[in-house]
Regions:
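Binuclear metal-dependent hydrolase catalytic cores
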Residues: 1-206, 283-320
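Cap/insert and terminal regions of metallo-dependent hydrolase folds
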Residues: 200-209, 214-313
Length: 320
């Protein structure tokens, strides 16, 4: 399994010389796995990084794109109207995301692509989109099989399948499950309903978790610990340093470097990649937040882990 970052900036895109190392596109990640069907690409979020990602997918001849949405703030959706694949009607685009206030993926796309905000109404391109609302985060599991593609199961059916190896009512065997990419979900601490995704590549045992747009908490809830536990790579929101957060950013729904380090240590994650870099942060400030994470680990009994902390950068590829 491998991940490529196409957008690691939070809140708004930036473009200035002082951000050239980590980049300025807003959130978009691509996941590579042998569990994906041939000709299929798996993405997380559709910030401005979706535009270069879509260009790469077009060059590869990708025929189906699965996009998992964490939530619908502008910095996670602004790539949709400008991505080439929005207009390629011979490519299927499947969008999965939470539903809140009556708004799921379809309603979000209808809203951001309509007059007077955008010249192309979503109805004109919707025929090759498939929109799926995830209404029970924590009670659903996505399973992607290389031959059968994605399906969403209830947690009880998924656990029954794991325990008994019976196809039952879900139409999937235990053997097929072990050939699949399993994606679990957890609700983050953020002003709107936001989803963290855990990716488990069953054939290799590799695990990655993306925890973006998540606020610091005094303690780690058991559900969150279990969601992250044993991850080979944790990509986590570390938008602020501690002084910024305490001065004026608490309650914004984002985290700090020292908190991300604590999550890494307490859940046993092997590596930690910071993401959702603040738009005001130059490269040296992003690196300073990494240093803050490393210092926390050294001061709290995990010095060996300090060197496994880094900041994600646009166009970076990470083997898991």
């Amino acid at each position: 399994m491998k991940v490529k970052a196409y957008g690691t900036r939070g809140s708004s895109p930036v473009a200035r010389p002082q951000t050239s190392v980590f980049g300025g596109n807003t959130t978009c990640f691509r996941f590579y796995s042998d569990c994906l069907p041939s000709g299929t690409a798996l993405l997380l979020d559709a910030g401005s990084g979706l535009v270069p990602a879509s260009r790469d997918l077009a060059a590869e001849g990708i025929r189906r794109i699965l996009i998992l949405m964490t939530h619908y703030h502008h910095d996670h959706t602004q790539g949709f109207p400008l991505a080439p694949h929005t207009y390629f009607k011979d490519v299927t685009v499947q969008v999965y995301g939470p539903k809140e206030y009556g708004v799921g993926p379809r309603e979000m796309l209808d809203y951001i692509m309509q007059a007077p905000f955008f010249p192309v109404d979503f109805a004109r391109v919707a025929s090759h989109f498939e929109c799926h609302a995830l209404e029970n985060i924590g009670c659903e599991v996505m399973v992607i099989h290389p031959d059968e593609g994605p399906r969403v199961l209830r947690v009880d059916d998924f656990e029954r399948l794991q325990g008994e190896g019976s196809a039952g009512v879900v139409g999937l065997s235990r053997a097929a499950l072990e050939e699949s990419l399993v994606i679990r979900m957890h609700k983050t601490v953020h002003p709107e309903y936001t989803v963290s995704y855990r990716f488990e590549e069953r054939p290799t045992g590799k695990v990655m978790v993306v925890l973006t747009d998540h606020e610091n908490t005094d303690s780690l809830p058991l559900d969150l610990r279990n969601h992250i536990r044993g991850a080979d790579l944790l990509v986590q929101d570390a938008q602020y340093d501690r002084s910024q957060y305490e001065a004026s950013r608490a309650g914004f729904g984002h985290g700090t470097g020292d908190y991300a380090a604590r999550v890494m240590k307490e859940t046993g994650a092997a590596r930690l990649g910071h993401t959702h870099h603040d738009p005001s942060a130059d490269d040296d400030q992003v690196e300073a937040i990494v240093a803050e994470s490393r210092a926390w680990l050294r001061s709290n009994g995990a010095p060996a882990r300090a060197e496994n902390v880094f900041a994600c950068a646009d166009y970076q590829e990470i083997e898991i």
